[in-house]
Amino acid sequence: LLGRCKVKSNRFNGPCLTDTHCSTVCRGEGYKGGDCHGLRRRCMCLC
C-alpha cells in the first residue's frame, strides 16, 4: 500500500507480537491504528 504514512509508536515497548495490541496502543496515541513491521518487529502506527 503505497503512500501510507507510518511512524514508530512512542508508547509501545518490546517486540511487537500481535497487530491487535499494536493497533490499540497506536489508537491511544491518536493514530488510526497500527501493525507490527519489519525484522525487528516494531509497532508502526498509521497516520
Swiss-Prot record:
This protein's source sits in the domain of life called Eukaryota
User: Which one Pfam family would you cite for this protein?
Assistant: Gamma-thionin
Q: Name one GO biological process term.
A: killing of cells of another organism
In terms of CDD domains, this protein maps to: Knot1
Supply the InterPro entries for this chain: Defensin_plant, Scorpion_toxin-like, Scorpion_toxin-like_sf
Record carries keyword Disulfide bond: yes
Disulfide pairs here are 5-47, 16-36, 22-43, 26-45
Q: Which UniProt keywords apply?
A: Antibiotic, Antimicrobial, Disulfide bond, Fungicide, Plant defense
| Family designation | Belongs to the DEFL family.
**What biological function has been recorded for the protein in this entry?**
Fabatins have antibacterial activity against Gram-positive and Gram-negative bacteria. High activity against P.aeruginosa. No activity against S.cerevisiae and C.albicans.
Q: List the protein's name.
A: Defensin-like protein 2
UniProt organism field: Vicia faba
